[in-house]
Curated annotation (Swiss-Prot):
It comes from Histophilus somni (strain 129Pt). This is Octanoyltransferase. Belongs to the LipB family. PANTHER family: LIPOYLTRANSFERASE 2, MITOCHONDRIAL-RELATED, OCTANOYLTRANSFERASE. It catalyses: octanoyl-[ACP] + L-lysyl-[protein] = N(6)-octanoyl-L-lysyl-[protein] + holo-[ACP] + H(+). GO terms for cellular component: cytoplasm. Its EC number is 2.3.1.181. InterPro entries: aa-tRNA-synth_II/BPL/LPL, BPL_LPL_catalytic, Octanoyltransferase, Octanoyltransferase_CS.
Length: 218
């Protein structure tokens, strides 16, 4: 197995905690020959707190469940119409094979994949050095959080495509007071702002940046 082999799994709509458990199990049981994987999924409405999450950033508790996660970062919201891309990558294997991939470079690749995808739709976006994620006109369109275990990554990014953004008003997104969120549907026609249309472009940009050339999709 080489670090250019990748499996993409299209998981549809699944419960956050179920997929989170599967990511942990995958990471704990993988070995040096396990191919890297990308999981594409949407989650029903849920707030997730990162490891550094502070309770005060949940402003108005509602019937939306709150899950304490093991990813980096603060609180965020997941809901239908948001494309999640989880990246299960053996960073240490990439390093051993000379690609010099580290966590910072993985974060940069994730952000750049989103910037390139949005550019495909004529949306100008940018990352921020002091606040991981991707922004359009100072509004956040993509959140990012990773966990590294045994030299391998899991969790990933959440790109707002065509969703109900109102639950974000119940939190300080990613721990930033007053941060406004946006989505692709704010800038392009609804028929273009669809997860099944955007996800392939996102994956293509990411796989090209990391040099995967043996890609299988399930």
């Amino acid at each position: 197995m080489t670090d250019t082999t990748l499996i993409i799994r299209q998981l549809g709509i699944q419960d956050y905690q179920q997929v989170w458990q599967q990511m942990r199990e995958f990471t704990d049981t993988r070995n040096a020959l396990t191919p890297d994987e990308i999981w594409l999924v949407q989650h029903p409405a849920v707030f997730t707190q990162g490891q550094a999450g502070k309770p005060e950033h949940l402003l108005n508790p509602t019937d939306i469940p709150v899950v304490q996660s093991d990813r980096g970062g603060q609180i965020t919201y997941h809901g239908l119409g948001q494309q999640i891309m989880y990246v299960l990558i053996d960073i240490k294997r990439h390093k051993a094979n000379g690609s010099e991939l580290n966590v910072r470079q993985l974060v940069t690749a994730l952000e750049q994949s989103v910037v390139s995808t949005l550019a495909d739709y004529g949306i100008k976006s940018y990352p921020k050095a002091d606040a991981p994620g991707v922004y359009v006109n100072e509004q956040k369109i993509c959140s990012l959080g990773l966990r590294i275990r045994k030299g391998c990554s899991f969790h990933g990014l959440a790109l707002n495509i065509n969703m109900d953004l109102s639950p974000f008003r119940q939190i300080n997104p990613c721990g930033y007071i007053g941060l406004e969120m946006c989505q692709m549907a704010d800038f392009i026609p609804t028929e273009q702002a669809q997860c099944d249309k955007v996800a392939p472009k996102l994956v293509t940009h990411f796989t090209q940046l990391l040099g995967y050339n043996d890609v299988t999709t399930y």
